[in-house]
A protein has these predicted regions:
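Structural/interface elements that position substrates and couple domains in central-metabolism enzymes
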Residues: 1-451
Length: 451
């Protein structure tokens, strides 16, 4: 390990995923000497070559710059001779197969810190956790060392795909186990962003992070529920949203769509499990999560009815466009992507279909590991397809000329758009290819009958 020996605090970041590596780059740029710890050898190797292992705007250039300057190095474990001032935990806290929050990686990271930290070290937890984890799990592990330390929960709240920019402009919430810990964490993050929000205790910081994400999940679920009402009454959800908020400041409904990703797909469960021993239950939040999780099956059942109307045979070709969990800002992240439950729901109703996938950033290997046939262009995805589904809102799908490419599809064919990227009345599709969008099922069916 070779770090540039200029003055500056040494920070060890445990976990070099989407959260850890972006933070590592920004901290290195702001004068910290950064050691990134990651158990995946491939990630360590790539990082030390200045090559990001995921897509993030500006990451390639900025990572290479701090690595070349000796400001950031990666390794598999905390070096024995480390003289670090700060330790930051950014490891994942995914759900297990049973649905419970996994804390094994968090505990392992904390134990590793405990073995290496010196007196008065600052430990910062940024991973999303159940309320109480900082005090009841992380703190006791560190206390066993009999060393003095500062501990704070400082949640990551950046938008994946735009994280490098948001790290330096978003307010940073800080909740320390005591005033000294909050002060120490503030001194660190003041070098990164200009706005610091110190809350009264750790629990407030923990629940604030969960509220940020679960409130968005609820908001999107409301939009999806209204879209289902529009589906059956013959309204256009896109028009409802636009009309409702035009010149009227008290209605701001988002568009409907698939809701997933590494945060929104699990944080409702983390919040629910946080209060499982109390009488109060997050009923609205959990009902909203179910609404969003039910979208794939709901749409698949509608498409099966549509297939019967169009008299499709069993051996149809179905292409999925947009496999990453979101398209804007662009990412190649498949964690929590709704493409997988959509794919599974479609297989239930079209078991003999051939399934292809296209994404601007997702690799051929990852596409094929999902069980899809890889296509390297939209043209190839549309060629001979009976059904094309737009799964995320990547700009490519908003701007590509569908009217010029639907001639490649089998007839009758359907383009189903989860994101309402096109104008229902002005798609100008090739004859025999029909457009359907979330929140306008009945309206689109009526338009199909008029063609």
């Amino acid at each position: 390990m070779v770090l540039h020996s200029d003055k500056g605090q040494t920070v060890v970041i445990l976990g070099l995923g989407y959260v850890g590596l972006t933070l590592a780059v920004v901290m290195a740029e702001r004068g910290f000497r950064v050691v990134g710890v990651e158990i995946q050898e491939r990630v360590v190797e790539l990082t030390n070559r200045g090559i990001p292992h995921f897509f993030e705007t500006q990451m390639e250039q900025r990572l290479k710059e701090v690595v070349d300057k000796g400001k950031l190095v990666a390794c598999n474990e905390i070096p024995n001779n480390i003289d670090a001032d700060i330790y930051v935990i950014t490891v994942g806290t995914p759900l297990s197969e049973s649905g419970s929050v996994r804390l094994d990686m968090l505990k392992n990271a904390t134990n590793e810190i405990a073995m290496h930290m010196s007196d008065s070290s600052l430990v910062i937890l940024r991973s999303t956790v159940k309320i109480g984890v900082t005090k009841n799990i992380v703190c006791p592990i560190l206390e066993k060392t009999k060393k003095k330390f500062h501990l704070a929960f400082c949640p990551e709240r950046t938008l994946e795909g735009n994280a490098l920019e948001e790290l330096v402009v978003l307010p940073q919430i800080i909740g320390g186990i005591d005033e000294a810990s909050s002060w120490s964490a503030t001194q660190v993050f003041q070098k990164i962003t200009s706005t610091i929000i110190c809350v009264s205790n750790v629990e407030t910081a923990e629940i604030t992070k969960l509220v940020d994400n679960t409130s968005r999940d609820v908001m999107f679920a409301y939009a999806n529920e209204i879209s289902m009402l529009c589906d059956v009454v013959g309204a256009n959800m896109m028009e409802v949203v636009q009309a409702g908020k035009k010149g009227y400041p008290r209605t701001n409904i988002p568009l409907p769509g698939l809701v997933g990703g590494p945060c929104l797909s699990k944080d409702s469960y983390i919040l629910d499990q946080s209060v499982s021993t109390y009488e109060v239950r997050p009923n609205i939040i959990m009902a909203s999560r179910k609404t969003n999780e039910d979208q794939p099956a709901y749409v698949a059942n509608f498409l099966m009815q549509l297939a019967n109307m169009l008299k499709w045979k069993d051996n149809i070709k179905i292409s999925l466009l947009g496999l990453a969990f979101k398209g804007r800002p662009a990412t190649d992240d498949l964690r929590g992507t709704m493409a997988i439950p959509v794919f599974n729901a479609l297989k239930n109703v079209f078991p003999n279909a051939t399934y292809c996938g296209f994404d601007v950033l997702v690799s051929q290997t990852d596409t094929e590991e999902m069980g899809l046939i890889y296509t390297n262009s939209i043209d190839h995805a549309l060629e001979d397809a009976h059904l094309v589904l737009i799964l995320n809102n990547h700009p490519t799908f908003e701007h590509f000329s569908v009217s010029q490419q639907t001639h490649l599809m089998s007839k009758p064919g359907v383009v189903y758009d989860f994101w309402n990227t096109m104008d229902i009345d002005n798609t100008n599709f090739t004859d025999g290819v029909y457009y359907f969008a979330t929140g306008s099922h009945k309206l689109c069916t009526n338009l199909m009958g008029e063609q």
